[in-house]
């Protein structure tokens, strides 16, 4: 699984920009909190994807390592 970090970073920047707009023009606490929530969801999603990719890389390394060991023996 390839993670497209720039895409997530763009989404994160977009959410931040929206949040600042809402705070500047519509000081509605509800909207601000909603944006903060969406921001945290994005961060959690990104972290989950990073963990999954790391797990897959580890599994791949382990499986290729075992294949290499059995060939050597």
Predicted regions and their residues:
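Charge-dense, intrinsically disordered terminal/linker segments
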Residues: 1-73
């Amino acid at each position: 699984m390839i993670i497209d970090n720039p895409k997530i970073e763009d989404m994160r920047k977009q959410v931040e920009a929206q949040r600042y707009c809402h705070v500047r023009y519509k000081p509605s606490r509800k909207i601000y909190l909603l944006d903060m929530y969406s921001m945290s969801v994005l961060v959690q999603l990104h972290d989950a994807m990073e963990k999954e990719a790391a797990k897959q890389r580890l599994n791949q390394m382990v499986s290729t390592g075992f294949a290499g060991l059995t060939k050597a023996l």
